Structure formats: C-alpha cells, structure tokens
Design a protein with these regions (language model features):
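Nucleic-acid endo/exonuclease domains
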Residues: 1-120
Length: 120
C-alpha cells in the first residue's frame, strides 16, 4: 500500500535530515544506515514526519525529546500513533537518553521488532 504524504513538507524534511539531533545521528550512523533492512530518515506520512521508517517491516522508529513526556506531547503522540496504526505501521519510541546511553539495547529492540514483524 502506498502511504499518503504531504509534498509541502519536502523542504522541511530535507532540513531535518541535515540537522539531526545527536541521538538521531548516533542511531542512524551506528545502526540504521548499515542495517540490512532499509530505513529512510524523516519519512513523510500524511501530516506527520517519522524520524526513521523501515517499509519492509512497516516500522517507525521515533526518538523522543523531553517535550514528548509532557501531557500535550503524550496526547499528540497518541494521535500520531493511532493514525500510523491505521496504515499498519508499528511505532517504536525511544528517548534521546536511551539512544545516547544504551545504543546497543535500542538496536537490539529494533532488530527484534523487525524480525517479529517480517517473519510473523
């Protein structure tokens, strides 16, 4: 299934790719970029931009800053997750801190989820 996207976001998506957070950069270069399952950075899906997306596993990987743990951020994340789930996309969320301090554990969880979704 082809996912909807907002073509008006293209310049913003390019900007996000050039200006990744430290956590996003670490995860991308240390694990996702060399991963045998192809990931896309800053994937536009409908009104949202996913930090990382693996089409073969229909998996979104989100790296969350502190604003995601405030009530408004949690409500927005819940709406975003529900929207993505309607397209069969599973969302994995990690904090910036998790990625920076436990990259190996984060990578293991991503790999476990990919294998579970592809070979279900």
């Amino acid at each position: 299934m082809r996912l909807p996207h907002n073509s008006n976001n293209l310049a913003y998506v390019r900007s996000l790719r050039k200006n990744m957070t430290d956590a996003e950069r670490n995860l991308w270069y240390e694990y996702l970029r060399p991963c045998p399952y192809k990931f896309t950075r800053q994937k536009s899906v409908g009104p949202y931009i996913l930090d990382f997306y693996c089409a073969s596993a229909q998996l979104a990987v989100e790296i969350d800053g502190s604003q995601h743990y405030e009530p408004q951020g949690q409500q927005q994340d819940a709406a975003r997750t529900a929207y993505l789930q309607a397209f069969g996309i599973f969302v994995l969320r990690f904090s910036n801190r998790d990625v920076l301090l436990n990259l190996e554990g984060v990578a293991a969880e991503i790999e476990r989820t990919i294998l579970m979704r592809i070979f279900k």
